[in-house]
């Protein structure tokens, strides 16, 4: 499984000759992404409707160009009206391609005062596990802590806190429940620094708790080898 990190929580997963784009959002977006990076897309997964995860204008162009399907919640569908949408919900498990399955996980977006009045409250939030038969990658979406017994090899999750998502301490607790072979922090490119985690503190806590991790730059790609993890 090959993983490329893009803006905020966006990931491009390449496996079994398929290209799966997760949460293409508007933060740090450039036209090069649409024109050269987010090309030949076979499926798009969207966790929730906030624009840093769902840049509707660009997603519609990708769908039209590549004729790909979008797997997302009914709330995203209500606001975005994408063509080729497959509506999914928590606990669904779907084989989207031969030997590639997605599992739809629980996710609970945090709430700040005023989000409901400004129509930014997230009612329906989901995460995804991509399983290609060899590797399981779990991207959590913007979620606060909850009990779970999800299993994965690669865990992609936020640590920025601020009442909206997992912070560093509760994020470590969340990660230890899952015990991944590799953790990739996401959701760290907000233009306001106060909305991003303290990277040095995050590294210290991950290392103290013995969690193997990789902090990826935008555009960076890794090939995950379950037998030889050396990041």
Mark where each language-model region is.
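Binuclear metal-ion centers of metallo-dependent hydrolases, dominated by the metallo-beta-lactamase
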Residues: 4, 81-96, 172, 176, ...
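Short gly/ser/thr-rich secondary-structure transition/capping motifs
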Residues: 2-5, 24-31, 53, 84-88, ...
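Active-site environment of divalent metal-dependent phosphoester hydrolases
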Residues: 27-29, 50-54, 77-80, 92-95, ...
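Active-site HxH/HxHxD metal-binding segment of metal-dependent hydrolases
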Residues: 33-97, 101-111
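Beta-strand-turn-beta hairpins that frame and shape the catalytic cleft
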Residues: 1, 14-20, 93-103, 131-137, ...
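Active-site-proximal loop/helix segments of hydrolase catalytic cores
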Residues: 112-176
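Active-site neighborhood of phospho(di)ester-bond hydrolases with catalytic His/Asp-centered motifs
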Residues: 21-25, 41-52, 70-74, 137-141, ...
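Pre-active-site segment of Zn-dependent metallo-hydrolases
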Residues: 12-49, 56-61, 111-119, 143-149
């Amino acid at each position: 499984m090959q993983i490329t990190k893009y803006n905020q929580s966006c990931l491009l997963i390449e496996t079994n000759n398929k290209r799966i784009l997760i949460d293409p959002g508007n933060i740090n977006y450039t036209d090069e992404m649409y024109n050269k990076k987010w090309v030949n897309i076979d499926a798009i997964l969207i966790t929730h409707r906030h624009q840093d995860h769902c840049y509707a204008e660009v997603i519609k162009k990708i769908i039209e160009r590549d004729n790909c399907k979008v797997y997302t919640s009914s709330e995203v569908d209500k606001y975005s009206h994408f063509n080729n949408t497959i509506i999914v919900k928590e606990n669904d498990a779907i084989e989207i391609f031969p030997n590639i399955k997605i599992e739809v996980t629980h996710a609970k977006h945090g709430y700040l005062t005023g989000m409901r009045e400004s129509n930014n409250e997230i009612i329906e939030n989901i995460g995804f596990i991509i399983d290609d038969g060899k590797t399981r990658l779990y991207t959590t979406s913007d979620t606060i802590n909850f009990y779970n017994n999800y299993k994965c090899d690669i865990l992609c999750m936020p640590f920025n806190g601020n009442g909206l998502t997992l912070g560093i301490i509760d994020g470590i607790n969340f990660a230890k429940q899952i015990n991944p072979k590799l953790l990739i922090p996401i959701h760290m490119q907000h233009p306001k620094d106060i909305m991003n985690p303290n990277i040095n503190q995050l590294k210290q806590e991950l290392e103290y708790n013995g969690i193997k991790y990789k902090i990826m730059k935008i555009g960076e790609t890794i090939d995950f080898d379950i037998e030889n993890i050396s990041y």
